Amino acid sequence: MIGLVGKKVGMTRIFTEDGVSIPVTVIEVEANRVTQVKDLANDGYRAVQVTTGAKKANRVTKPEAGHFAKAGVEAGRGLWEFRLAEGEEYTVGQSISVELFADVKKVDVTGTSKGKGFAGTVKRWNFRTQDATHGNSLSHRVPGSIGQNQTPGKVFKGKKMAGQLGNERVTVQSLDVVRVDAERNLLLVKGGVPGATGCDLIVKPAVKA
């Protein structure tokens, strides 16, 4: 089963009939329009390419305009691709709504996490801080030793150090689907998802469900 592209609206909470508060993320899933269907003969694999939302005409490049015109769909804010399973069939120009998830219990959500800039090891990797006193006057938040001796004489790859934090592709798996609102094109999932408000999210049925 393919996924859909949506937009993060924000977080809120809803209550069950028993009065239990459930924190949910609201994802707006506008109709995904099929722009291309790839097959084994021409592309070597089966997939469907979709777009969603709208893009100003003066922001659409000529190659994009031709691609959207060939498919007969309105220019969207981007292009995304989903692999097709055996038996799944879609046609160019077809519109896919959030009702795709009507019978889905859990989903995986992929997005770009918030960028935090250059961060130290305490914030980036949850390193423990060193003593505030007891003779320590300079090394409160430094990482400490990053290696051994003349042997091996190098810092190993993957060593946790200070650097860019966030702004990377992150997937949160197996989030419960709390509600599918087809009228307002909304999908409510339990818990938080990566990224800032307004960012694009890829929602797929959970692989571990």
Swiss-Prot record:
Record's comment on post-translational modification: Methylated by PrmB.
Kindly state which keywords UniProt assigns to this record, in alphabetical order. Answer: Methylation, Ribonucleoprotein, Ribosomal protein, RNA-binding, rRNA-binding
Q: InterPro entries this protein is in?
A: Ribosomal_uL3, Ribosomal_uL3_bac/org-type, Ribosomal_uL3_CS, Transl_B-barrel_sf
Q: Which GO BP terms apply?
A: translation
Could you name the Gene Ontology cellular component terms for this entry?
Answer: cytosolic large ribosomal subunit
Give an example GO molecular function.
rRNA binding
According to the UniProt record, list the residues that bear N5-methylglutamine. Q150
Q: How does it assemble?
A: Part of the 50S ribosomal subunit. Forms a cluster with proteins L14 and L19.
What role is this protein assigned?
Answer: One of the primary rRNA binding proteins, it binds directly near the 3'-end of the 23S rRNA, where it nucleates assembly of the 50S subunit.
The record ties this protein, via NCBIfam families, to: L3_bact (TIGR03625)
Family per similarity comment: Belongs to the universal ribosomal protein uL3 family.
This protein is called Large ribosomal subunit protein uL3
Which source organism does the UniProt entry give?
Citrobacter koseri (strain ATCC BAA-895 / CDC 4225-83 / SGSC4696)
